[in-house]
């Protein structure tokens, strides 16, 4: 906006006092008048009535009295500053301009005259015998050519007084614009105070600045000169300050109230540009406010257009704030801008974001220019503008701000309480530096877009809302081609991994709304290694660093230089069916923007192949109304001990599924392949227990427990084949109820198809997985049913074949480390397994063959533990007493006394899980056996199939055996609390070879 130059006459007279005698005193002011009067009216300290129709052209009267002289306490005026009200302006183009040289020579043409002056002076000069003599002098006010940096200059010419007794006085008064309110100040300095060898004192002055010719032939104005304010709801205040030669200042003020504001016209218009712009592109944008420069009406009824007070420039939805604007942009502080200071702003260069062009009638044919600076944002107001018209003749400093509709992203720029200054054109331009940092980015869709300016005048009239439109062109066909990338600094199979996933969206593609990245099986995280953050805390950005697993970098915006924002990635607890989550907390704070920390939640979904799907929630498409078109998302998961590589070295890519705003989908892959599989160990171990009391004889249905354990950081199993002991088959009549694939996938297998339970432990999950074991429908009619392990989110299916042994094969096991898998098949009359011979008459063996994802294989033959051989302890009359001591010092001692109703020839002892054998040598050397109360030294003592076995020499037999295992024979596998009960299983071997079993619980002693 521009500031108007008021044509101001400084009634600066030839002045005061007797040189050398005046004291340092102030100069009192009285009778101040500053107001419009009717043409032909009297301008004095007692003027004609006020005639102040708003926006009209009226003569303007400034009059005042000064109390100067040579008396005690009086001083001469050195400087007079007259400040006219804001909105009282003069048009320097209304009259010709007289050169300063011609003015001093008294040669100004009447076409340069813009007013008259009258002054009453008192002279004390020799020609009047130093008798104070009062006289009235008159003169003219001229429009002068300016000096550099001045908007206007007035020349006040006082004619000769007393028939030539006084020489003409020529005073020049430069005009300056007040930065605070754009009002005009007339400043006259170094005023004369002597005349004709004596002193000259000004008693009063009256200055008339013409409004318009209005039929007065003595006036030669080319157009109206003075114009009144267009505001009627407040007084128009004038101020005068007189400074004496002694440095003392006196001020006075007066006011008038304009009238008839309802008669003031206001018919603005609007232009916007560029008139055409390519779609979805950052670039220059401008709006031009236009106010007619011609009057409405003629003569005394002529009115200037009302001054603009407020404007709300409403941009269409789609023309949005461009996030990359914040790249390198910093705010200018109010102190740096210098509101109210008549000096250029001190804002840094990287605060500039636009320019202004200002056309005012004061400078015909000229366009004043200035800059738009980025001001300090306020809460809820991310875009603040400081505007400076940077012309030394007319310096304007204005403030504006923008509000953004949080739903539509439409921007409204607000400029309020603008100074009362006339302009015909004010063009506000958001520039484009050419590097993608333009303030605005164009709409995505082609078509016409309207801009509206709600313009409110100072006269209190109706808001005018001119509109204009621009056209968006060059729309590309809807394209959605997102990119997916993955990088790892170390791809050692089974080793620690630091994974960076990159999602890219080319410019002008459809906006990305969500993404799902499917990691290949084996490339996964160890959830127990990191304490998970609560979901509510994560959404509130309150996760601690204990849950931190990586970092993020998100870039948003259109054009060649999107805005890059940093972030952190936290592991969270599971939600909405996910086993866990990732909270990506992006910090939006940069010097030019602070929308807080934005948290986007991601679900970690476990697939049936044990791979992880990372599924984002819907990405926010705008923040406080600022669009966030995602250009790239980089997530780096590098917490030590969290991620690990797959144990398969086959190429297995990451797969991305992306959804655009509007529903369009696209896919992309990123290559991944682990290396060094040959370096991985592969040593799975199997244990098996079969049978129970009453279910070991031929044609019985024994339960079966198979446990497979494997150390961590080894290759994962890909194929496992287990061959059960000879003599164990299936009972076909118990295989009638089976589960179909559809039922299994739905978790709805018939109850009759369940044959057991399964539990799996993996270092990847904080808790074990468990579920049922089911008979599956055979691959073809007449085939044996298959078997399925239903662990809920993981389901493994195996095949069953019957030859010399019953063989179960699990193929295609996912690449996931299993530290322990326990399979329990139920025994009993309806069980699937059936014996063809007594299990207690042999040593059953289980054959196991393994193949790993790394390519390594392993096999083993394991003796199965048979449970339930022999009669029960109660029916055999087996009684056991014993004592366990020494656990406090971790040197356990065990003594047992076994009494049987049947004759025994040996004993087997199964230890609890808390104890183990120290060594076989110590057992043989230190273990003591008593038969019938006497120590027996011919006993064979050995460790076999997880049991301590005591066998007497051939022919020896007894119904009572005592065993003592002193310190050193047994060792503790883990701590045993004093007073806890430990369970031992005792098997008595009868002379017929049958086993009599019983369990005893012994209280652990010190």
Task: Tell where the protein language model's regions lie, with residue ranges.
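Positively charged n-region of N-terminal signal peptides that target proteins for export
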Residues: 1-4
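Bacterial N-terminal signal peptides
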Residues: 7-17
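N-terminal signal peptide c-region/cleavage motif recognized by signal peptidases
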Residues: 19-21
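Ser/Thr/Pro/Gly-rich, low-complexity intrinsically disordered stalk/linker tracts of secreted
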Residues: 24-1006
